[in-house]
Amino acid sequence: MSDDKGKAPKRTEDESSGKDGKKIPPQLATLLLDQNPALKQELANMDKDQAAALLHNMDLSQMLTGLSMGGKNQKDMASYKFWQTQPVPAFNDAANKQIEQGPIKIIDPEKVSQTPGALIDGFEWCTLDLTNAEELKELYELLNNHYVEDDNAMFRFSYSESFLHWALMSPGWKKEWHVGVRATKSRKLVASICGVPTELRVRGERIKVTEINFLCIHKKLRSKRLTPVLIKEITRRCYVNGIYQAIYTGGVILPTPVSSCRYYHRALDWLKLYEVGFSPLPHGSTKARMITKNHLPTETLTPGLRPMEVKDIDAVYDLLERYMRRFDMNQAFTREEIDHWLVYKEQPDKEQVVWSYVVEDPETHKITDFVSFYNLSSTVIDHPKHEAVRAAYLYYYASETAFSDDQKAFKERLQLLMNDALICAKKAHFDVFNALTSHDNPLFLEQLKFGAGDGQLHFYLYNYRAAPIAGGINQKNLPDESKMGGVGIVML
């Protein structure tokens, strides 16, 4: 296939037929392969007859492996062949109306390898010690130089050392789940994959899972096929500790999302977002008009709103637990996790990562509402004026009004609470406030002038099968109040 490397293999038949007699027109096959570099590369590495046979036996859903609605692709992560070997739901499972919820594969602890798999020559496994400032800095530098960028290489997530400490050292964290790969000679950290333990509720079933994050590979090693090896190694380490399920997210379509949400963005400093290329100037509008449109009051409006303190942990824990149970897939918090994830404890050498606020009823002193957001900035690549976009991400929230039968009152309360969160974020010098269509967010996104993003976030369960869960969007990919009640977890 040397002459056709990277192109869809030619066929003598009029169409490439998929399984079960489904036909994939050659034009569609070519289009899908053009948007799917992982599968394209796999076909390019085969001889012509092998590639034609594989394509002939694939159905349309299988060809979607590795596609992203936003055009973003992680070639290695999206490997069709790799995901065929993993205990994840197949695309066509979604067509089965009677999906039996539960583990896909029962793991025999006796058969779990106690040693890591082989790595390519010149590289070796390591376990990161994030209590060691030098190793934490190494992970910070790897992520800041080689982690997620947007399509146009204008922005890259910028994880601070404080953020990594917060995200990876939650209650019950395990050092061995902070996995790295080093170059044997230089000792340089060139890849990572990390996990933290948590507990999910999926339609009432409690599952101990590992939350997988920070899969990152040095740009110069992207062709080395390290991603499947990293995933297998973190899986092995979780199995050794008796955890057989995981949750992870991504912008790429893999087999098979349990849910998908859409990103929405609310400008806090519209002019800066325009200058860095994040926000466009709508046709027929002006800069002055857009600044006015996105203006916020200087003071919050909810009586009794104040920063959350340690003394509020029990009340927030009770409120949040009741609120979260309303969703098909949610995080089952412990009191210790509420303390870790939501309470900011000021330290002179660490920047603030999370902002949490409670509403204390002025008369009863009961906590009636709670809202939080966290800081995840993005580096602006090669910009003459701005170095970073300071982004607030909506985190967890809850309100007692959710438990009444008055949906209108709940909607109004949520809009008031979220508008105050925007004001608090603006006061804390954030440039943009991001939120998904998860939780009850469709009740306020459009009303509070959030704009639709071009990114989707797909949620995946590893070694666990569940019927599809609503992500707050309809078939037109717009927020829909009738599609709420599904996703109730926030992944960092």
What are these regions (language model features)?
Residues 2-33, 37-46, 52-58, 65-91, ...:
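Active-site/acyl-donor-binding loops of N-acyltransferases
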Residues 94-97, 191, 242:
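Conserved ATPase active-site switch/coordination loops adjacent to the nucleotide-binding site
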Residues 130, 134, 225, 329, ...:
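Residue-level detector of secondary-structure boundary/capping sites
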Residues 217-260, 268-269, 285, 299-311, ...:
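A structural/positional concept
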